Amino acid sequence: MAEKTNGAAAPNGAADAPKSSPEQAQDVADVPVTDENGEQIPEDTVLSLTIVLPQNSEKIPIAVSPHEQVHEVRQSIIEMPNALQYSCFHLEHKGERINDFAQISEIKDIADGDEIHLVEDPYTEKEARIHLIRVRELIGAAGDRTDSVQGILPGLSVYDTVAAEARNATEVGEYEFNAGPNVKALLPKENDPQPKTVKAIQVSPWNPPPAHFRQKGHLLYLIITTNEGEQFQITGHVGGFFVNKSSNSKFDPLPRAGPKAYAAHSLLTLIEQLSPAFSKAFAELQEYTNQREPLSTFQITNAIPAAPWLVPSANSAACTHTPDITRTQESFLVSGVENTDTLRDWNEEFQSAKELPKDGVQDRVFRERLISKLFADYNDAAARGAVLVARGEVAPLNPTEGKDAQIFVYNNVFFSFGADGVGTFTSEGGDEAARVATAKDVSGVKLVNQLDIDGLYTPGTVVVDYLGKRIVGQSIVPGIFKQREPGENQIDYGAVDGKDLVATDERFVPQFQKLSKALKVKPHAVWDKEGKRHDLEGSVETKGLVGTDGRKYVLDLYRITPLDVSWQEEVEAESDAPEYPHRMTVLRPELVELFVRQKMREWVSSEVAKRGQAKKDQAAVEEKKEAKAESEEDSDSSSEEESSSDESDSEESSSDEDEEEEKKPKKKSVPKKAAKKEEVKEEKKDEKEASSDRIDVSDFSFTLNPDVFSGQVPQTDAEKEAMAADEKDVRDACEYLRKTAIPDLLNDLRESEISFPMDGQSLSRLLHKRGINLRYLGQIATASDGPRLQCLKEVSVREMIARGFKHVAAKHLRYLPLPLTSSCISHLLNCLLGTAFNAKPTAEIDPSIRSLYDDADLAFENVTPEILRTAIQEEVARRFRYTLASDWYNNLPHLHMLREVCLKLGIQMQHKEFIFTAEGAASQPAPVPVTNGNGNAPAEGSKKNKKKKKAARDTSPDSVTSSSTIPHTFVPDDIINVVPIVKDSSPRSVLAEEALEAGRISILQNQRKIGQELLLESLSLHEQIYGILHPEVARVYHSLAMLYFQLEEKDAAVELARKAVIVAERTIGVDSQETLLDYLNLSLFLYQLGDSKQALEFTKHALNMWKIIYGPDHPDMITTINNAAVMLQQLKEYHESRRWFEEALRICEVVFGRQSVNSATLLFQLAQALALDQEPKAAVVKMKESYNIFLAELGPEDKNTKEAEGWLEQLTTNAVSIAKHAKDVEERRLRAGIRFTPRAGAIGSTSTAANKVAKSEIERPAAASSMDSRSIDELLKFIEGTDKQKKPAAKKRTGRANPKRRGAEPVSTKA
């Protein structure tokens, strides 16, 4: 049984199987670093240097690696507490300036213990602006920001709150398993306001400096108001900052004379001189900041932070909108007066980064880090531009075209709509096909970027979904807008103008060959409209373009895999079903990869089979040769030996010596010549066998033609034959998807081989990993029959409904003006989720806003719950070929569906207790409507509100909620914000992944030291390339935490798991499945370290999140609840532990059934828990049930059955003893004339017996003596008592039958 318990407590998300060899990764870690003389510097060398600061010649020791770059050391310096004030400086070694982009090893005569001097530089205007931004951040003077892309509270983390509660928990409370989800767990506890260091620091209205002062070195002017209330006018000069003579009405930026003539190179130092209270306040601010985990405070720079779907109300401390004049000046501080700092040539940057050398490890690190940062910057810029385009803030380049055909350029990014504005996809499904094609294109670009083929370039590509619009952002390829000469094609390779013309520029062949080989695409023929044949390396839809920069670009990567023809034929054959929206139903690249592997296995099997007979024949021939050779050698040896014995004795002696020779090869009595021949012969035989068994996989080749079933018309018989063969291969791939991929997934889930998904995101990830398209959700839901797959069915149906709602909402939002979108979203949500509270919801629109948009399409007003349900049912039937149950809307889990919808549409809802039913309304106080960002509206009658509204209409539109006469679950004010959903094409780091995989392999091969070095190298590479706050870094922390846990490095595992939790919360989401699993791992590792109390609190938090993400009774909860019960036993909380075991058993019975081995295992553990909780009778009953199930399922000889039998015997013996002792006590009391209600928990001997029995490591034989089942039954009857007159005993049994009821009465939980 111990083995089963350990199995249940295994870390979540086991590491994937490695793919690369340790030799490859050894190359990653072992490329030598050389100094300027070419001499090798050992990799693990660390130089101890001393940084000498300019003020007071203060010295700071610093340890650096020789392969670090100087600008990394610079960054480390400015993050040190003693050097915070420096931002504009250079470093010098022995009087010589050091290049910021050189490696430490390249510094001339650098040696361990050397001093590096920090030398302050003159400021430029840009450096002065950067310095001001940095100082504002450091002293906490920067106010809150309104960010259109990242939303409200981006990169939220609740770890600090959870950890504080875990540390401060004094006693283990009774956990409410039946309680509903608590959305408060999604938000951190409100902190005290941070200490204020200055009242204000802002750019002066005297900016920019006039020409004659600019000539004197003036860069910008500032105003600082200290905490003492004094205001100072500051000049930013090339030499630093000083107090000037200006006032708010008089301009004199020259230095002030007299006692207040303060000046300093750093603004931070200057403020310290100006304000006596600053130093103390700044120290308090740093102390305040240090109370939180550093990872939860760092700014996220290399990824778009996760935006929470539930945010505090506008009146909360976390979202208070404070006045900050500099917030309006930030665009100037960031990009300057001319706004030239932020304009970047994205395409040139991408392609130049791709062309960087990648020979050595440091070259690859630098290249991949630059590419990662570049993609992060581009994705952010493209998302911001897309939001502006969607809101109508950017003028189109072709305003006379239809809305969907308009194109835009903003911030050097080219934008277009993901719709069929020019009729390109008319035959494929119009707008729907165009929408799918853009998503497939960005995935294709990501795949090509990952392959990193030399000489083949892609534009930076991003797809943004925002308020129903899909917008594509691409870096501008040089020459893409160029007007071509007559007869010259716009495209150099692939289809031109649909598929009427096909271009075949030979310059693209080498690169497209590499691409097609990697993507398993078959070189094939296509035909233009005139029937002319063209041989292409890739799909006709994949285009090649030679830019004016001479680079070869690949475009339109939405058809890199073949069509799912089985799906198309199936939906076309359904006469009564609605038509599928488009014909862009391509197979996933993951499926093609899996199918090719399957084909490879089949090929290897056939090769083995082919060689089988030949091998047998060859073996027979060799046996004959060996027999002949042996006979010759025997005759030779017999003639050479001299012996006086007869011939038969000689033969016996010879054979005996041969046998000894096999055991002892150095026996001298055997002829050396014969032994040598035998050895050579065996070696040759082994070599032959090895060479014959080895199959060269490079001989295998299997590719698919992506253009079959897409209108290609072969001309000759040979071409038709080739096309038919290609079509068969594609049909086989489609068959593999339906007959193998989907059934394998269902089987793995049914057998608990993999974790069940919890929500739509995890379901999508799981299906895509298995190569299954989401259009098969309907089939998966239909096939998920039985209690074991009920969870999968629920998640699949929820996902289909949420996606159906998303498409319906997108149609209404697409052309709606921004101020009306909150009314639209809230009304549609009321129709979906609020009908149990208000069966006839009405849309709430501010009349003043309505009057401003006379031409707006307000069709959402007419949507009723019935219309919305019908529309969702149609979408689900159309897209997933699934028919929802007739009353599906009555069974929706309200909060979970709200979360799914918000995540899909990017909605940020106001945090409140949502009222979904009339019963819920009775227990909730009436909500107070918000009229503006900082105040509450008085609760008045609706008529009065309407009059007020009419009077105030011309000045400021009031809150819509105040005019509401009938309450709704959602009101427009609940929709706080909408953030864009971004799909990017950023590649992952190949270098970091190689090191991680090789580390795993080394550990599997028991090369622990090398493995750990490689794991550390991988961690370092991930952090260097991505930055610390990135989803990929969260995942590597997760993987490494588990690997270190398996290596018994428990402290390191806990630290990595803690980092994984925080980084995942901030970059993936507070309530994502990945974050939840990270919390469970952290909990498990803490338990193994002996901190059961804190481990239990993290488990409870994970369960609370589970309720929000999925709800109760998720199959994977069984393991988690079981683990928590074990933790409670460790804390000697026996009664609470028993409640957790009972809950685990309840879910197990729902999922696996009562008569299952899983239930028997939990019954076994529950029986032990009952014994510890002083319930001997119940313990015997549960152990007997466990024994009977094991006996029926596994047989009498199984170790689990024997162990249960042994426990049953001992528990029964102890229970009989306790029952007998209780009867004796009762009889003595009766004789004395006193009668008490007996309680097992009150008898002293019970506690001792229970503790004695329930030790998990009990010292006794594993296989107990067999017991007569009838005697056990008799003993049970004796324990339970047959005397009907003992009413108190009967009452006690009733109470024990439902242990959950015992929560109301005091229960002894003594050790």
Curated annotation (Swiss-Prot):
TPR repeats lie at residues 491-525, 1034-1067, 1076-1109, 1118-1151. It comes from the Eukaryota. Residues 324-568 form the Clu domain. Residues 1-18 have a biased composition (Low complexity). Residues 631-661 have a biased composition (Acidic residues). The keyword Repeat applies. It is found in: Cytoplasm. Residues 1-27, 606-694, 925-966, 1276-1311 are annotated as: Disordered. GO terms for cellular component: cytoplasm. mRNA-binding protein involved in proper cytoplasmic distribution of mitochondria. Belongs to the CLU family. This is Clustered mitochondria protein homolog. It comes from Pyricularia oryzae (strain 70-15 / ATCC MYA-4617 / FGSC 8958). The gene is CLU1.
